[in-house]
Every structure is written in structure tokens, then in C-alpha cells.
Amino acid sequence: MACIRSPYLPFSVSPRHIAQNPNHANPDMNDTFGRIYLTHDLPGTGGHIKEQPEDFVVQEIPLYDFSDQGNFALLLLKKVNLSTLDFVACIRKHLHLRDEEVGLAGWKDKRAITSQWVSVPRENISESRLDRLTGEGIKILQIRHHSNKLRTGHLLGNHFTILIRQADAEAENRAQAIIQQLQTFGLPNFYGPQRFGARGDNPEKGLALLLGQYRLRSVRKRKLLVSSYNSLLFNLTLKERMKKDLFAKLLQGDIAKKHDTGGIFLVSDPEKEQPRADRLEISATGPIWGKKMKRAGNKAAALEEKILSSQGVTPDVFRKQPGSRRSLRIALKEVNVCQEKEGLRLEFFLPKGSYATVLLDEIMKA
């Protein structure tokens, strides 16, 4: 079948696929990454974020301590107003590395001040190379060593300090009310807008890669784009459950996740397990499609497969992807809220893979 050039994207897309799925040609990400509020009955604070990089500070928390022995150097690096891809490019350039030699536990926001650990081969570290690296808007905070490379997911989570400027006069009270409700029912675990790219076109590129209609040399970028399409499908699944009042309810055949240990299990008796969900001990999960994903059953499977079918794809498209399950909710812990002269300041921790912008959407509704 012949392919046409998408008017929005620099790659070819099947005309049949666009005809079946017109949203793929220009996905409306405002309708997919979280513009549905669990706390819709509570007024938001309004305001603006990220007016300055220092308004959005992120500190990565490692999953484990480092042994200070081994063939990998672990660099705690601080970056300012730098995307993760540009950040990695700087490291590669000045430490003379291939892309796959740079290990990251997670991706970070661009317009922010972020600190995160990066692993590189120990043999590539020298004082002169590190000096050149620090001239690129990057600061080295600490150097340690370990026996293995950092990989995606090797973090406990992130600590955030965020300033909301020009918020409503009642912002502090409004934020507290919203946070209390989210702590009771859980925070929707949507993927945030940064997952989908500045133009919102990463999911379409990811789909084209899956369909063999787009090629990309960089392994890191390929993984990012394919993951973005899977993230969109997860968001659609979560939104559908919220619309049907199934956000905090368990369905027959759900794959539930334990918040304390991360273990997953099949829900065969929803009524029996629901009290644990009400206490936020467990939550239903959504699909991250791939060969290792544990498939839901019964009613839960029907809902997930309906979303997939609505996009014109089948599970076979993801046969080469790893796959997993992602909790629909986050058990939100303590959030510190303080009204300051500059605005409303929030401090909180989120587990790995969760997005501060989703919490801010609920609080600000701006």
C-alpha cells in the first residue's frame, strides 16, 4: 500500500490507517494526557508554573545505594533549562561516549532545575573531560562508583519543589482541599504532556515505528517514541474508567497492584478485594502493551481491548515490546503547601514514572 506524507509530521503514514484513525494525523493531546479531573467539583488555584527554571526543581531519589566499587562512574548532575536528549548529547560529546553507554534512571523536565544520577564507563572519566562538561550548563554535584549501569526505572522517585505564580487569593485553602481529596481516593496516574513531545506528535511517530512505516537510528529515541504511543493508550484507558466511575473500583478480571510491594495479581472476586482498594492498599492497573504484559480478563479485558480496537490496532503490533502493567492511581503522600510572597509553593514526592504536572493540573485547573 502506498503511503502519504502527514501534513503535520516528517514521516509517511498509511492512508488507510489515517482514514480509520483521523486523530492519529494530529492527535489532540489536551484530550488525552489528563484534562479530566478527579477533583472537578473543587475550584482550582489558577496561576502559572515554569515562568523561571527555578520555579520547578526536581531531585531524583535513587532506588539503591551505590557500592563505591565497580567499572561504572555515577555522576550526580544538575542541569538547568536543558532537555534530557540535549543533556545526554552533552555527556556523549564531552566524555566521548556512544549513546548506549550513557545510563539514566529517568527522564526529566526541560524548563526546570533538575538533579539526577547518570552512569558512564569509569574509564571515560578524566578531569579535563569533566571540566568541559560543566561548561554546558551542567554542574557536577557528586561522583560515586558502582558495579552496574543505571537503567530506566532504577529510581525510587522524585522530590519536587514547585512555585505557582499569580495564583488565586484563596489558593492555599483550595490546594489543601484538593490534596485532601486526592489523598483519600488517589491521584490519577496519567502520563503527563511532556511524554508526548512539544508538538504532541510523539505517539504518532511511535505508531509509525511499530507499523514499520518510519525508521530511526537512535535506539534511545525509538524507545521513547514507541513508549509514547503506549502511554497514550494507557491514558485513554484511564480516562474511560474515570468517565464510567471505575477509577477506584475493581472489575472482574482486573490486574491489581499492591502499592507497598509492587506485586500484581488477578482480581477474581472484586467484592472481596474492594475494601483494600478503598484503603489505597491496592489499585487496578492499565495496560502497557507488550509480550510480557499480564493480560486482564473478563470485564477489565473487554474495556482495555475496546480502547485498543478504537485506535485500529491489535495486540500483535506490540509483539516486540516488553510490556507491563501501570497502576491507575498513586497513593499520594504528604504535600507541603505554603503561601509565599512570590506565589504558592508546593513540596512533595512522587514515585517513579509519575508526573508532577498531573498533580498540578488537579490543583491549578488553569
Regions found by a protein language model. Name each.
Residues 11-366:
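Non-catalytic, substrate/partner-engaging modules appended to enzymatic cores
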